[in-house]
From Swiss-Prot:
Organism field: Caenorhabditis elegans
PANTHER family: VITELLOGENIN-1-RELATED, VITELLOGENIN-RELATED
GO MF, one annotated term: nutrient reservoir activity
Name of the featured protein: Vitellogenin-1
Name of encoding gene: vit-1
GO-annotated cellular components: extracellular region
Region (Disordered): 1505-1531
Span of the signal peptide: 1-19
Amino acid sequence: MRSIIIASIVALAIAFSPAFERTFEPKIDYHYKFDGLVLSGLPTASSELSQSRFSARVRIQAVDDRHIHLQLVNIHMAASHLPESEQIPSLNSMEQRELSEEYKQMLKLPLRAQLRNGLIAELQFDKEDAEWSKNMKRAVVNMISFNPIAPRNEIEKIESSYDKEEQSEENTSFFTNEKTLEGDCQVAYTVIREQKKTIITKSINFDKCTERSEIAYGLRYSSECPECEKDTVLIRPQTVYTYILENEELKESEVRSLYTVNVNGQEVMKTETRSKLVLEENHSIKSHIEKVNGEKESIIYSSRWEQLVEDFFKNGDKAEFAPFEKFPLDKKMHLIKTITEQIQEVENNIPETSHFLARLVRIFRTTSTSQLKEIHETLYVKADKKIQSLMEHALAIAGTKNTIQHILVHIENEDIVPLEAAQLLKSIQETPFPSQTIAEALIKFAESRVSKNNQVVRQSAWLAAGSVVRGIVDYKNIRPLVREDKRELKEKFLRVFMQQYKDAETTYEKILALKSIGNAGLDISVNQLNEIIVDKRQLLPVRKEAIDALRLLKDTMPRKIQKVLLPIYKNRQYEPEIRMLALWRMMHTRPEESLLVQVVSQMEKETNQQVAALTHQMIRHFAKSTNPCYQRVAIVCSKVLSFTRYQPQEQMIASSYAQLPLFLQNSFSGAQFDFAAIFEKNSFLLKDLHASLDAVFGGNWNKYFAQIGFSQQHMDKYVQMALEKLESIEKESTTVVRGRRIQTGITLLKELALKMNIRARPANYNEKDAFAMVYLRYKDMDYAILPVDTQLIEKLIEKYISNGKVQFSEIRRLLNQEHEFETHHAAYFYEAIRKFPTTLGLPLIVSGKIPTVFSAEGQFSLGLEETELRLTVEARPSVAATHVYEMRMFTPLFEQGVKSVQSVRAYTPIKIQAVVGMKRNFEIVYKVVVPENQKSIISLTTRPVVFLRFPGFSKFEYIEAEERTVVVPQWQQKTQEIEKVFNFLGLEVSTRGNILNQHTLENWLLAEQDFEVSVENKYRPAEFTARLTVGQLEKTELSQIKYNKIFEKEFELEQENTESRREYFTKMVKSIQKEQGYKSVVSLRLEAPRDYTMNTEVTTVCDKQVRMCQWEVEIRRSPILEETKEWTLRSQLLVVRPEMPSSLRQLHDQPHREVQLSLTSTWGSQKKSEVTVNAQLQQSKEQKKYERNMDRHFNGMPEYELLIKAARLNQINAVAEYKLTRETEQVLARYFDLVKAYNYWTVSSRPENNENDRVVVQLTVEPMSRQYVNITMQSPIERVELKNVQVPRVYLPSIAQRSVKHLLNEASGSVCKVQKNQIRTFDDVLYNTPLTTCYSLIAKDCSEEPTFAVLSKKTEKNSEEMIIKVIRGEQEIVAQLQNEEIRVKVDGKKILSEDYSAHQIERLGESDIVIELPEGEVRFDGYTIKTQLPSYSRKNQLCGLCGNNDDESTNEFYTSDNTETKDIEEFHRSYLLKNEECEAEEERLSEKKNYRKYDERKYESEEYSFEETYDYEQENTNKKQKNQRSQKKSDLVEKTQIKEFSHRICFSVEPVAECRRRGYEAVEQQQRKVRFTCLPRHSSEARRLVKEARQGTVQLDDHKISFVHSVQVPVACVAY
């Protein structure tokens, strides 16, 4: 029975419509009053807004229950600039605006609507109705479309009504999807029912729409920033409907919509629409509304007009409809002529010039091909150069199919010069209307004759084609909610680009093809690019470019990019550059934690140090990034980095990555500078260098907003070869002799290779493959490439070098030039447009652009006369740029909106002269001339503006907008007024206006500023001259240097023989003064108008060995400001360094080992300040104690290594006596107070009464870690101490250190060490092999033209002493230890130590020599051989027991015939030179236990095991003997050991070795007795010592011994 009842009710529900559908009764004429208001302005109270009001009477006639007819009558418009009010202002309070009869008739055309469940289902318009008119009528119909019943299935409805009879009378709230004028979106209903009155409220959720008539252009350059999207929504629409029904009849309907533009979360612009529909009367129909029979359409805003315009822009005359054909050509030409005449009226560019450019762009976008041809023939041809250039650039900026085709035609006809054509193609790259036809036109042009004949044009065309294709296929679609299938288009263009790649014959052409693919950002290109990357037959620059071509896919398919690049990064078979670039690209895909864990794992076990170093730096910098778009990645990187035990090695030349993020706190704006440099062992030049700028403004992320990069392959080898060709040709006889000697040396090395069956390692590169390029990237698009290949270099050499002689005539012809130039350039730095509908049926357009015009004209001359090169440039540059950010409504009826305008103008006429001459002295003269009677101007203007334009569009004339600047008091308070005029060196400088004092992006958009700086020269030309003169090195006497006083102790009284030290010092100085000295003078003179001068002269006097130097500085300057006398500075600095000790014993016995410094300085004008500083660079007590403990009998390398450490100077003592002016003293006091405040927690001070005008300073660097500094300063009134201030690791000078050149070699080179039977290779592989009395080849240049070889053998069986033989070119050097002294033979003849330098041999200490190689050096002390080569030396062309120096530790064992083996015995035997002079010791060679390769994670402690030394000395010695480029994966550290008890704390008196706390464990330990001293736990000294002991070692020699305890001390550690 129940089911029958339910079925009956369902039938009734279907038969009858709900009550609200009968709002309009049939045959009744309803008259509603419609009022619409548009407000545009700033979101601030009491500011003026542009307001336009639309009023009409709406007639609605219900044809039947489901159809109505609607017509607008009595239409009126009014508009004014008024403050905002809550109610719609009356028509009388606003200025009346007349509508043309054509527009009125259009608006009066009727429409027919079908209602379904209260909603407008379909619309029919008159066939003559225009799109803009239809949309305005949609806005009216939209106000009567509502359905207050919640959607649910029929059974639920009936059961609900069956249970609750009065359900319809209750208040309800629900969500549903509904079509409105603004789209198909989720809406929220609230229904409140009162007695006879029902109030219905409806709001729209724009985040949940399936369809919206939204269009966007120019957004393809931004990258995704997920972290920014939630808080930085640029445009936020809000719409609320309110319906009031009485007795089921619609009495009133109101719609309010608010659209705001937000920057950094703050509203900066708004547009508001208000619509109200009020029932005035209803009566029976007296006159019927005409029936319409147009096509059925939806209520959603129609963007057909926008689509027609877009189709015209993209396809030109081939479009189906010409939307601008009603705009007559003669009126366009008249407007263009008017604009060009206005531009010509002003000599220089002004902000209006950029506005004129924007107007030209708008006009050109409406033109057809025939119209452009007419404009060209009528206006362009007759215009001057500036107007022609502006018109060309305006056509390129317009970026429509017609304008682009017009430009390409004229480039093909060679009407535009190639350089200008390339600039225009760069502008075309940024067209906001990319299309298939434009891309095809560019590709066709790139294959044309003109392009093939000019590489600059061809390059620009292909890059532009790629960028346009990106715009076509980019996922950031023109219509965001519409997804089109573009696979066919992608495949088509990919085939074109890949065919270009396949047809390429040179490296440059292949790279150009790949850059075109990269600019296109085709996701389907990943597989082809991957094939190129992994194909080792391809040249390395091509494979690297293939990786770079994946950059635009980081947002669309990050996982796919990671899937391609992660295996490449982890595969050690690939080249290091490829792996590092793969990692770099992969990191920009913002990888997840699971992937980063794999990267860190690979880093920890990485054998290539360049790859490991770059990986660590990259992850570390990403972890510290403050870029809001990388916050998730930063957190993950921090996490994975905290768990790694990898410690990067210290290298001077290593691949590196750095970031400099500059972001505003709590805002999503800022910039980030990225820097990446990739080095490789086979090149002394950088392999890759990238510097980029990322910009984030209000959450809009422009990745690679600008980038410049350099990449090269084998170019260093080719450059080296080319430079050799440029060397001067020596005399014929010398050349012949030298050539014979070199050939003899090469023959000697080749004979050695023949004896040992060494196969030459040919270079793995072809000179013709050498390639380098510099590229420029803008907005993530490759913009320009400058290739450098062998052909270019050879052409230059052929042109300027002939028969080995420089062709000076060609060089003079190149350098003697004189030109006049005039250039003009125009561009949009960006243009972005977004359009979406409003509830008034009007399109709202939010756009931004920066039209910029730059001009420069002048003369340029370059001349070479004898030894003088002269450059003169006279230029008059001017630039004008305007940033326009606007929000506007546009219809033919009117145009209204709000915009923020920022304009910059600069005009700076200038003349520059530069002269470089080399006569008696080297001289550079640089002169800047400000012309007379000319004014340089730099101005800045910002203002928010509201505007109105009636009508909005005219076919016959340009309608000027009614603008009004909005002044907001709260923003004007953030500016300051400036008005100042002063005279500077004869120039009148004027600054006037107001400028912001709080700089944020929103302040720049909303505040009114008008600031100008002008510089005027009213008299003769003002010349500013800088003259730098570098004098020749002259001989001089050193007796003029007086230095007899040594530094006296100030802080400590130490028992030492002061008299003997003074005598030693005086004797040393007198000895130096007897030698020949050298003097050089460098002067700099600055001259300015009004007889202003400044002279600086620096005189340097030094002895030949630079042991004693004196610098004198004298500066004279004309008086300025309130000075009445000449300002002068006279300073003299004298430095004397001690003699360089050659052994530890000599260091210990040397009375004077300090560096003496003396500075006297006087400066000032009327009042003089004087300072005298005596300083001494010396050793602290701790360092001296360390040196005394080292005083043992060492020889050879161990002695020298310890000597370097023992001779370090780690303390500076200085005494300054001064007489300062009060102002100077106050400034210095403020700075000192600032230092004390900054180090508040580490500084202590106490008052003292010391000598006046005297300061004593002591600075001590902790000598072990070199990361902590103690500073003590004693002033006349106090004593200040700063303890344990942490600083970056400090380099401590050593008086025993060799030259800077050798220091750099040690820090940056590759080292191989041979000791006993143990070898550590160049690539840090440690293994044992038995050395015999037969020569073994340690290292050799195994190229086809070898330069050196190093061999070694034992002097006797079971002896640790060795003999070394070095074959270096034409020389054979043999050395061995005899009677505790190294004996050397060169070509079989003994040489004395004083003759070493003539043979490029140096003696270190008493038994250590250094033999220089063509690249690098060999050190030998009789027991150990240390071969050191530059890190880039002979990669894969070295052979011998030291390996191949290729930075890979997995492929060390290549035999002499270049075959890889795992058998160390086989490897060793291949490099064994057997002859009758030696016994092969076959038993030792065959014993397998004599061969062993150590695990790379272990640290072998067998090196330099001297039992008689202290543990600390041994540990430091061992670490120094380690190859400095190894990772030091295991290490021992010295610390003071602490033992804690209940009431006391005990400290070890001497440091105790232990493993590093994290990641290491002891593998071998020994017992050691250690002395301890104890202190009460509660004592302050105990707490202080605990703190110091945790940071390093503590000196406790003067404390009482409490007990001796046996502890376990590690001998070696291993990373676990």
